[in-house]
């Protein structure tokens, strides 16, 4: 987030919710990108590469697909922040997602303000770490 517009991919198969989330990120100064499936998310990340700073992933995308998405994202871009937004908070799901590389696992309902704050915080911490290195 070093004086550049942060880019986020919103990966949610609900088109209305995806649009709603992207609009809120835009209002907070983000450049947003839509993905309605795990494959679209991978394709978008392949297209945009290191310009992507964060990805929000809907936990409704089957757990195994979400895990494979996270694994593939990590292979493509180790620095992107991955946020899983789940409908339920089973501890084993959270542990698995975090073990495979998710940066945050949050259970819905959660306000957009809270989601954006979590993303902002992770990006700020990453920028500070990059400066300190």
Regions found by a protein language model. Give the residues of each.
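Conserved phosphotransfer microenvironments
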Residues: 52, 56-73
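Acidic, metal-coordinating helix/loop segments flanking the phosphotransfer/catalytic sites
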Residues: 34-54
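Alpha4 helix (beta4-alpha4-beta5 surface) of REC/receiver domains from two-component response regulators
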Residues: 68, 89-105
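C-terminal output helix
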Residues: 92, 110-119, 127
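Two-component/phosphorelay signaling modules centered on CheY-like receiver
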Residues: 15-34
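Conserved phosphotransfer cores of two-component systems
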Residues: 46-50, 73-79, 100, 121
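Negatively charged, flexible loop motifs adjacent to catalytic sites
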Residues: 40, 62, 88-92
